[in-house]
Amino acid sequence: MVAKKLKKQLHFTLFTFPPFVHHYPDGWRHPQEMLGGIYNPLEPEIWARVARTLESMKVDAFFVGDGGAIYNSNENSPSTSLHYGSQTIEFFAPQFVSMVTAMAPTLGAVSTVNTEELNPWTFSRMAQTMDHLTKGRVGFNIVTGLNPGGLADNLGVEVREHDARYERAEEFLEVCYALWQSWDSDALVRDKERSLFADPKKVREVNYNGRHFQCRGPSQLPRSPQEIPVLFQAGQSPRGRQFAARHAEGVFTISPDLPAMQSYYRDVKDRLVNEGRRKSDLAILTGIFPIVGSSESAAQEKYEQLVELATPEAGLAWCSGYASYNFAQVPFDTKLSE
């Protein structure tokens, strides 16, 4: 008997940094933009409407980014980011995800979580709580480096080198895995006759003692619906791709053109096999930026308006934040090497 070939499933998510909702510098100035005055994006009603719209469209998930801090690398100050609105205000992603999943009871949601910001005990509890309360509808985008400088400034720590952050993240997830699996699936008994709430023989201490983290455990919660929540990754570097191949079930990526997308796809899938996993174990979500209008010409006009609104200063603050580098010290016409 010949095995049937599995059909590929197309997945859609909406990716945004609420209440900041776009990826165009100065895009908030567009007449139809939410941050431009049509709606107050800090109020929950608009996001409930967005979530329910996504739910009705059968979109897989609301994918929520989180930069962790106001970008302050440009001129070593947050002033330019604040002035031009360069990805400045952001909700704490896990709490936002908790709200939208309550507003849209069948919608999936993915929260970005920075391993440099949280410790594994806090994150593991948060993830299990959300997994239980959403009945398994949440995932987490594990990142290590978006705006590392701004985040480190607010935590009072040194900025770790790129690969060192991934090394720490590996240990971070090791602790989480151990905590999430510290209860057997049948450990919660609730037997009134025997006065047995949970079977101690089926709940284990973790006793993790690593270079970066120490944790005794066990988890404070029994196993959640997914046991291990769906993990995503969004790293573009070779180290980030390796991390994704080892841990993720989904990857979010942005590529400049089709050949770059195909190259990224092949590389990550090959790394997946090298980790002993199947290529089908990980979905790759490639970002697109649709400009929507009542007609093609209307959409083109909107695109041209967005380009016209963008200022070099806003873009510079944005790039400086992403790279944690003060690009203001580099002349605008300087060609940057890799």
Summary of predicted features, one role per range:
Residues 26-45, 111-121, 157-163, 225-238, ...:
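Active-site mouth loops of central-metabolism enzymes
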Residues 18, 68, 115-117, 144-148, ...:
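Active-site-proximal loop/turn and secondary-structure-junction residues that shape catalytic pockets
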Residues 10-16, 62-64, 107-113, 136-142, ...:
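Hydrophobic faces of well-ordered beta-strands that scaffold small-molecule active sites
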Residues 12, 54, 58, 100, ...:
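Conserved, mostly hydrophobic/aromatic
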Residues 69-70, 88-92, 99-112, 233, ...:
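Catalytic cores of nucleotide-enabled group-transfer and carboxylate-activating enzymes in metabolic
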Residues 103, 111-154, 160, 168-172:
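Hydrophobic or amphipathic alpha-helical targeting/insertion segments
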Residues 3-27, 35, 163-226, 259-338:
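An alpha-helical appendage that flanks or caps ligand/catalytic pockets
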Residues 2-103, 226-229:
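N-terminal beta1-alpha1-beta2 module of alpha/beta enzyme domains
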